[in-house]
Amino acid sequence: MVGYRQKWVQDLPPAGGFPKLKYARTSTSPIPGAYIFAGVFSIMAVGTYIFFSDKVERNAREEEEKRRLSMILPILQAENDINFLASPHQNVYFTRWMPPQTGKRAAALLRDL
């Protein structure tokens, strides 16, 4: 059996001592209000620009869709009339059934133009 003794050594502070701790209250330098105002204003300006540019495109697409539907609606109405007249139907004076009304859609589309 090998017998050895480990010498116990206490840890000591470095020569000259530890550096002083800074424990005083410190705060970051305040941001001037003008910088905050400019930042918020620029973000709002960019957001407003994006919103209104998208609104212009969206309105153009809706206008094109309305024009397209107003051009094709007479054809759809004629097809609906042909299907109605070709089908055997009861006398309109003794029934409450009515054909689908595309006239209301046409009036609504033409009113919006």
Swiss-Prot record:
Keywords on record: Electron transport, Membrane, Mitochondrion, Mitochondrion inner membrane, Respiratory chain, Transmembrane, Transmembrane helix, Transport
Keyword rRNA-binding assigned: no
Membrane topology: Single-pass membrane protein
Transmembrane segments: 31-51
Entry GO CC: mitochondrial inner membrane; respiratory chain complex I
Cellular location(s): Mitochondrion inner membrane
Presence of keyword Protein biosynthesis: no
Highest taxon of the lineage: Eukaryota
Pfam families on file: GRIM-19
InterPro entries noted in UniProt: GRIM-19
Similarity annotation: Belongs to the complex I NDUFA13 subunit family.
Subunit structure: Complex I is composed of about 45 different subunits.
Function: Accessory subunit of the mitochondrial membrane respiratory chain NADH dehydrogenase (Complex I), that is believed not to be involved in catalysis. Complex I functions in the transfer of electrons from NADH to the respiratory chain. The immediate electron acceptor for the enzyme is believed to be ubiquinone.
Alphabetical list of PANTHER family matching this protein: NADH DEHYDROGENASE [UBIQUINONE] 1 ALPHA SUBCOMPLEX SUBUNIT 13, NADH DEHYDROGENASE UBIQUINONE 1 ALPHA SUBCOMPLEX SUBUNIT 13
UniProt protein name: NADH dehydrogenase [ubiquinone] 1 alpha subcomplex subunit 13
